[in-house]
Amino acid sequence: MEITIVAVGKIKERYLKEGIAEYLKRLSPYARLAVIEVDDENAPENLSPAEAEKVVKKEGERILAKITPSSFVIALDLKGKNLSSEEFAHFISEKNLYGQSKLTFIIGGSLGLSREVLERADFKLSFGRMTYPHQLMRLILLEQIYRAFKIIRGEPYHK
């Protein structure tokens, strides 16, 4: 299975870089993983709705340019479907079973994802109604993908 994570912005915090590197290493026996970072737009604090939309649209164009046509696209979105870890494992397993071996997860920037990116998504996934920093979300997503593979293989880890 090939999994790509397309994420807006660069990770600056060392502890996040180390956590991400650890899960990428742990995932290597299960899938080929790639993390693609696209530049975030410079956005001052008090943006008007029109300015915010421009920022999200520009980031969205960068995201869409990184998605391969054959990939099944999963956008992380507050309005997406909530899945338990077991349901997420089943979801990944089913995609692989039915020949969808390329998955692309999309993590937007601090202002979210553009309408165009959400329309391109084949599935919208939510990690709950809480808001997380998009940099931290990358680590959380990788941990859940790792957990899913452990569940799929019946290997110890998941409690």
From Swiss-Prot:
Pfam families: SPOUT_MTase. S-adenosyl-L-methionine binds at residues 76, 108, 127-132. InterPro entries: Alpha/beta_knot_MTases, RlmH-like, tRNA_m1G_MTases_N. Keywords: Cytoplasm, Methyltransferase, rRNA processing, S-adenosyl-L-methionine, Transferase. It is found in: Cytoplasm. The keyword Acetylation does not apply. It catalyses: pseudouridine(1915) in 23S rRNA + S-adenosyl-L-methionine = N(3)-methylpseudouridine(1915) in 23S rRNA + S-adenosyl-L-homocysteine + H(+). Its EC number is 2.1.1.177. It comes from the Bacteria. GO terms for molecular function: rRNA (pseudouridine-N3-)-methyltransferase activity. GO terms for cellular component: cytoplasm. The keyword Transit peptide does not apply. Homodimer. Belongs to the RNA methyltransferase RlmH family. Specifically methylates the pseudouridine at position 1915 (m3Psi1915) in 23S rRNA. PANTHER family: METHYLTRANSFERASE, RIBOSOMAL RNA LARGE SUBUNIT METHYLTRANSFERASE H. This is Ribosomal RNA large subunit methyltransferase H. It comes from Carboxydothermus hydrogenoformans (strain ATCC BAA-161 / DSM 6008 / Z-2901). The lineage of its organism: Bacteria, Bacillati, Bacillota, Clostridia, Thermoanaerobacterales.
